[in-house]
């Protein structure tokens, strides 16, 4: 019997983030407490999102609105790395970026976790910014998935190409 395998990746559907961004922008423009505060949210580049507002409190409230929209669209908050609010003139700005791909350091942590606590006979290989996990038994692969879901590696993990 051939080996079964799956890939562990950390990717975000950009269209879903775009939808969440537009929903948050619409809410910022219509909500009463955001009127005349200059609060806005927009893309700045391919992977960066910028929030602006007149006060730091309104900026953080706008960030909460955006995070709420991400959660509603089933996007993990670990996939969005929000920076610190910075003041430029009379406007406060906050830039955040999307976190995609598994770094080599995180991939090594995940493979070590699988080797130490996973079922015997399970192999994990680092392939660029993803991880291939293979085994002869599918039950072992499901045990590895539940093991990884129960652990926090600081990034959003997805399990794809299960075969």
Swiss-Prot record:
GO cellular component: cytosol
CDD domains from the UniProt entry: YajQ_like
InterPro entries tied to this protein: DUF520, UPF0234-like_C, UPF0234_N, YajQ-like_sf
Assigned keywords, A-Z: Nucleotide-binding
Nucleotide-binding found in the keyword field: yes
GO molecular function, one term: nucleotide binding
Family stated for the protein in its record: Belongs to the YajQ family.
Functional note: Nucleotide-binding protein.
Entry-linked PANTHER family: UPF0234 PROTEIN YAJQ
Name assigned to this protein: Nucleotide-binding protein RHA1_ro01989
């Amino acid at each position: 019997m051939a080996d079964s395998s799956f890939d562990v990746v950390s990717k975000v559907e950009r269209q879903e983030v775009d939808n969440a961004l537009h929903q948050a922008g619409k809410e910022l423009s219509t909500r009463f407490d955001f009127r005349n505060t200059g609060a806005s949210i927009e893309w700045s580049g391919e992977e960066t999102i910028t929030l602006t507002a007149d006060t730091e409190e309104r900026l953080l409230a706008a960030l909460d609105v955006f995070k709420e929209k991400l959660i509603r669209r089933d996007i993990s908050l670990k996939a969005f790395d929000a920076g610190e609010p910075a003041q430029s003139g009379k406007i406060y700005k906050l830039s955040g970026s999307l976190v995609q791909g598994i770094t080599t350091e995180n991939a090594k942590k995940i493979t070590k976790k699988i080797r130490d606590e996973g079922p015997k006979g399970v192999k994990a290989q680092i392939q660029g910014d993803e991880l291939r996990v293979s085994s002869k038994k599918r039950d072992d692969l499901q045990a590895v998935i539940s093991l990884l879901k129960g652990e926090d590696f600081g990034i959003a993990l997805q399990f794809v190409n299960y075969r």
